[in-house]
């Protein structure tokens, strides 16, 4: 069991120990400011001088180019309680250097900015007494005590940061209490009453550490079978039936993840990037589904991408590999979301359930156990032996709607199994509970979307209210515009922050040359500045003319600035790939970088181009 921690920072480094009331565990963790790194000391070596700071959790340690740092969760807020366990969301973080008041160079400062960016944008959750990385069903199999040793590595977000601590813990079990697995996603519960039965309804979403990243920089599958934007979402329910004196606990798992083939959308400043497909991905796809079958059993694949236009090649590529696998445990269904739900008839998504039932999916396939008043398991009534894996292009907006509808369908059967709702009645008649349910799923949708796309989810008006509205459509327009800006100009650093935090890039083992300087040709770097200058001149001639706007001098400036603006903008969009803010730490896989030279073979800069391993679908059918 873990708990709050205190630390002292001085000239010798940072010293950590458990807060008071933790029994006989007197271990002190010392993150030294020299090459010794992490050490385990006795209680007598905890500093008696210096400010003692109490924190919620130690997320772990990271070594950058020059120094080591502790990543700390300072403050938290409670987001839920379930069967006696409290869920917390991290509110405030700190990055503490081992070198007290030390100066750092510009490269080290950039790495620290990336860490701060990741901590600022992320939603981290944990529980001192419950393992949030595992589902209720998996936790039942590994035992009641929360421990990093049984945590699911896929969702152990600070797995890399705790590497030193985990190595020590293999020899010294006292260190276990310092290792707090954290998930990135969503975790919240709400209390309600349904037909005089007290219930707790909750939602937990866990983002995978493998192939993690942003919308356009982590698509498809990698050679190890990991896919972009993979999330496991668990709907949990506790119902205390006063008549039978039984406490029922339920769990229903769903997954989402990018289409498991080699594909990408290459940003080029256009609203729809260039869609490209990679080489034969059958082996990687097989690895992905072999993993999913081992973890979840039968997989029901719900594909929501459009069947024409820009998205068609992805649909066809997915169906091709599923057909080639010919696996009896893989059940594929295509649902034309935009056609079936056209004109905002989003209730028609329930037609998908009919398709899934014909393939063999049952709303009785969930985990169900009975516990006593102390929270101990009395009986395992049922286990979940399959999973619905949903995807659209981004695995965000359409996917959110479908997952919430499926979970609503299963929740009805869970209430019936606990004798809370009679067969033939519906729990949706309870308006406060329905509102809580819809808000849980809408907030979850936003959390998943912000992590991947940088904005809240689209279509959450349907998830939140059960119907599509014009205001919701307008909010979707604003979010889409924000996504366009972020995906082209701010997601590069955000992807770098993922790769740095998760250990995909380790500065202390990297080359001497800093990855951060802009090495594009000078004229490429100047174009945005020229556009800004032209816009400034245009604004001045319109709003602050020296004489009147139609004076010859003013019109000359206006015409000149307009020509410069038009030519510069045309050049920029024609060569859009050169102006995207690409990640700098880890290769995205679908790009190659070329060195350019002048006639004297002097280096002029770096240019980006599409990798020859990827090609544009031909022909690409359009609307």
From Swiss-Prot:
It is found in: Endoplasmic reticulum membrane; Golgi apparatus membrane. The chain crosses the membrane at residues 524-544, 553-573. There is a cross-link at residues 246, 358 (Glycyl lysine isopeptide (Lys-Gly) (interchain with G-Cter in ubiquitin)). Pfam families: Syja_N. Residues 545-552 are lumenal. It catalyses: a 1,2-diacyl-sn-glycero-3-phospho-(1D-myo-inositol-3-phosphate) + H2O = a 1,2-diacyl-sn-glycero-3-phospho-(1D-myo-inositol) + phosphate; a 1,2-diacyl-sn-glycero-3-phospho-(1D-myo-inositol 4-phosphate) + H2O = a 1,2-diacyl-sn-glycero-3-phospho-(1D-myo-inositol) + phosphate. It comes from Saccharomyces cerevisiae (strain ATCC 204508 / S288c) (Baker's yeast). Keywords: Endoplasmic reticulum, Golgi apparatus, Hydrolase, Isopeptide bond, Membrane, Transmembrane, Transmembrane helix, Ubl conjugation. PANTHER family: PHOSPHATIDYLINOSITIDE PHOSPHATASE SAC1, PHOSPHATIDYLINOSITOL-3-PHOSPHATASE SAC1. Component of the SPOTS complex, at least composed of LCB1/2 (LCB1 and/or LCB2), ORM1/2 (ORM1 and/or ORM2), SAC1 and TSC3. InterPro entries: SAC_dom. Residues 115-454 form the SAC domain. GO terms for biological process: autophagosome-lysosome fusion; intracellular sphingolipid homeostasis; phosphatidylinositol dephosphorylation. GO terms for molecular function: phosphatidylinositol-3,5-bisphosphate 3-phosphatase activity; phosphatidylinositol-3-phosphate phosphatase activity; phosphatidylinositol-4-phosphate phosphatase activity. Present with 48000 molecules/cell in log phase SD medium. It is a multi-pass membrane protein. Phosphoinositide phosphatase which catalyzes the hydrolysis of phosphatidylinositol 3-phosphate (PtdIns(3)P) and phosphatidylinositol 4-phosphate (PtdIns(4)P). Has low activity towards phosphatidylinositol-3,5-bisphosphate (PtdIns(3,5)P2). May be involved in the coordination of the activities of the secretory pathway and the actin cytoskeleton. Its EC number is 3.1.3.64. GO terms for cellular component: cortical endoplasmic reticulum; endoplasmic reticulum; endoplasmic reticulum membrane; Golgi medial cisterna; Golgi membrane; host cell viral assembly compartment; mitochondrial outer membrane; mitochondrion. Residues 1-523, 574-623 are cytoplasmic. Its main location: endoplasmic reticulum. This is Phosphatidylinositol-3-phosphatase SAC1. The gene is SAC1.
């Amino acid at each position: 069991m873990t708990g709050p921690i205190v630390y002292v920072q001085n000239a010798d480094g940072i010293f950590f120990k458990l807060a008071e009331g933790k029994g006989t565990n007197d271990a002190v963790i010392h993150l030294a400011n020299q090459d010794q790194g992490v050490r385990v000391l006795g209680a007598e070596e905890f500093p008696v001088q210096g400010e003692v700071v109490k924190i919620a959790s130690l997320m772990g340690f990271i070594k950058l180019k020059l120094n080591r740092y502790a990543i700390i969760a300072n403050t938290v807020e409670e987001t839920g309680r379930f069967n006696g366990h409290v869920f917390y969301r991290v509110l405030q973080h700190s990055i503490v250097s081992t070198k007290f008041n030390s100066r750092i160079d510009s490269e080290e400062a950039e790495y620290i900015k990336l860490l701060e960016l990741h901590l600022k944008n992320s939603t981290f959750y944990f529980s001192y007494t419950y393992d949030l990385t595992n589902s209720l069903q998996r936790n039942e199999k590994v035992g009641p005590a929360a421990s990093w040793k049984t945590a699911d590595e896929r969702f152990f977000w600070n797995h890399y940061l705790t590497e030193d601590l985990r190595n020590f813990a293999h020899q010294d079990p006292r260190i276990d209490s310092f290792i707090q697995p954290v998930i990135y996603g969503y975790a919240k519960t709400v209390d309600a009453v349904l037909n005089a039965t007290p219930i707790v309804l909750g939602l937990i979403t866990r983002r995978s550490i493998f192939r993690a990243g942003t919308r356009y920089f982590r698509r498809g599958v990698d050679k190890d079978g990991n896919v972009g934007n993979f999330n496991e979402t668990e709907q949990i329910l506790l119902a205390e039936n006063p008549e039978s004196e039984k406490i029922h606990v339920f769990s229903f798992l769903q997954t989402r993840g990018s289409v498991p083939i080699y594909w990408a959308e290459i940003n080029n400043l256009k609203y729809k990037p260039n869609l490209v497909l990679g080489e034969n991905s059958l082996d990687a796809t097989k690895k992905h589904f072999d993993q999913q079958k081992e973890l979840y059993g039968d997989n029901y694949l719900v594909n929501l991408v459009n069947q024409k236009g820009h998205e068609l090649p992805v649909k066809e590529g997915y169906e091709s590999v599923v057909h080639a696998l010919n696996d009896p445990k893989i059940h594929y269904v295509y649902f034309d979301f935009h056609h079936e739900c056209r004109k905002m008839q989003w209730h028609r998504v329930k037609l998908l359930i009919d398709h899934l039932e014909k393939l063999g999916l049952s709303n009785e396939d969930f985990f169900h156990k009975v516990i006593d008043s102390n929270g101990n398991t009395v009986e395992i009534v049922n286990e979940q032996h399959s999973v619905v894996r949903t995807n659209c292009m981004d695995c965000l907006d359409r996917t959110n709607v479908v997952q919430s509808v499926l979970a609503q369908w299963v929740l009805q059967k869970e209430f019936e199994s606990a004798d809370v709702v009679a067969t033939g009645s519906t729990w949706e008649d309870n308006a406060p509970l329905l509102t809580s349910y819809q808000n849980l799923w809408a907030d979850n949708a936003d959390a998943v979307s912000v992590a991947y796309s940088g904005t809240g989810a689209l279509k959450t008006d349907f998830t939140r209210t059960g119907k599509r509205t014009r205001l919701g459509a307008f909010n979707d327009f604003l979010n889409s515009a924000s996504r366009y800006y972020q995906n082209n100009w701010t997601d590069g650093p955000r992807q770098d922050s993922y790769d740095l935090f998760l250990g995909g890039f380790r500065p202390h083992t990297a080359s001497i040359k800093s990855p951060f300087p802009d090495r594009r040709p000078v004229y490429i770097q100047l174009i945005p500045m020229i556009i800004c200058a032209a816009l400034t001149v245009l604004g001045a001639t319109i709003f602050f003319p020296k004489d009147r706007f139609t004076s010859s001098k003013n019109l000359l400036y206006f015409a000149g600035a307009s020509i410069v603006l038009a030519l510069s903008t045309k050049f920029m969009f024609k060569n859009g790939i050169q102006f995207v803010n690409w990640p700098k730490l880890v290769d995205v896989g679908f790009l190659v970088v070329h060195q350019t030279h002048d006639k004297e073979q002097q280096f002029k800069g770096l240019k980006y181009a599409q990798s020859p391993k990827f090609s544009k679908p031909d022909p690409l059918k359009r609307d």
